[in-house]
Amino acid sequence: SVGFKAGVKEYKLTYYTPEYETKDTDILAAFRVSPQPGVPPEEAGAAVAAESSTGTWTTVWTDGLTSLDRYKGRCYHIDPVPGEEDQYICYVAYPLDLFEEGSVTNMFTSIVGNVFGFKALRALRLEDLRIPPAYVKTFQGPPHGIQVERDKLNKYGRPLLGCTIKPKLGLSAKNYGRAVYECLRGGLDFTKDDENVNSQPFMRWRDRFLFCAEAIYKSQAETGEIKGHYLNATAGNXEEMIKRAVFARELGVPIVMHDYLTGGFTANTSLASYCRDNGLLLHIHRAMHAVIDRQKNHGIHFRVLAKALRMSGGDHIHSGTVVGKLEGERNITLGFVDLLRDDYIEKDRSRGIFFTQDWVSLPGVLPVASGGIHVWHMRALVEIFGDDSVLQFGGGTLGHPWGNAPGAVANRVSLEACVQARNEGRDLAREGNEIVREACKWSPELAAACEVWKEIKFEFKEVDTLD
């Protein structure tokens, strides 16, 4: 007779191991599992562990040719989610040998590849990952990181200011460059290509790069400050993307940009590597993230996508505002902002952090607050995000009644006033509006901005909430 018993067997017999002690080298995952009616949580959790590691739906004779005990994922703990019927957090440990070194692509293919279409589950969400130091060390991470960026730009002790050029589509390269110049001349540190701006018929990429470089050099000469424009190198194939980054380097500009989810992790890691070797900073936009992270019970939480970006490489990444028009509940947002910036982050479920994460000196990423923010939000942004952040006002700069440069002036004055007040020990949460009003006396540009945006609010209930 054959040396194994054929047929379908329950996953939990092999893959549910509550007695397992996790290793320091394991990758740990926290999944929010919603089983189909009648499927016990142990079976559902074990199924997730199996299908995202060594398992298949039946016993196969080739199982005997390897050591399942060495390579299988294990569901080692299950917690019911409070307030939800039949929903569980299942913790899974994966042996490090299952993953290719330095490949975010392979890590995701394994952990979230097949299992999300699994019939025994109604829904599945990856809430958090613990990346062990042994695996972190196989990644180069951000091209430069927060400290090196500050040194390159010679800007310290305050958040950096940006602005997305609008209208995002339709401007000619010359007019686009003019808008860039006005914003930088007015006092911003950076301007930004919109994520949709690649190389369209109305503005080919090379023309845009040239006019933006001219704007950067002119504004630098006039202000004595280092300026940058995020030139979007995202393209239809990776060779073209690198070609655009090479051209940016030849122009001598400080920073390029990439849409890391639509472009893909493989392309992103290649670009990050090029940027490191050639002294370019890399700004990352998260277009498409909400498709993946918006549903509470299915998909991947953004904190996982943020960790993945830090491994793949990027110096800035968009991370919500807490205020403004885009999603972000304060504690949760600050949780993944710290995961981006800090070297060591303690487990803290009140901030949505399921595991203690040690980045072992991988460079940090600057979070970018962008989307529906204006001068009245400045006090909150400075208080929430602190100095290591980029605050991006698109409409909040270009929508100024007097034009782009005065819009930039208003934002810079508002920022400097808030930072100075904070440094003097004043309470931004309580006195913030007063601080901005005082600054209006010295800046007619700020006064005009405060008047325009005094009534605007985006009031909707948060979607991304804690249990």
UniProtKB/Swiss-Prot annotation:
The protein's Enzyme Commission number = 4.1.1.39
**Assembly and interactions?**
Heterohexadecamer of 8 large chains and 8 small chains; disulfide-linked. The disulfide link is formed within the large subunit homodimers.
What GO cellular component term, any one, is given?
chloroplast
Q: How is the cofactor bound?
A: Binds 1 Mg(2+) ion per subunit.
Its needed co-factors are: Mg(2+)
What this protein is called in its record is Ribulose bisphosphate carboxylase large chain
- Native organism is Eriodictyon californicum
Binding-site residues, substrate = 114, 164, 168, 286, 318, 370
N6,N6,N6-trimethyllysine carried by residues: 5
Q: Which UniProt keywords apply?
A: Calvin cycle, Carbon dioxide fixation, Chloroplast, Disulfide bond, Lyase, Magnesium, Metal-binding, Methylation, Monooxygenase, Oxidoreductase, Photorespiration, Photosynthesis, Plastid
Determine the domain of life of the protein's source.
Answer: Eukaryota
Identify its protein family.
Belongs to the RuBisCO large chain family. Type I subfamily.
- Disulfide bond: present as a keyword of the record? yes
A GO biological process of this protein is:
reductive pentose-phosphate cycle
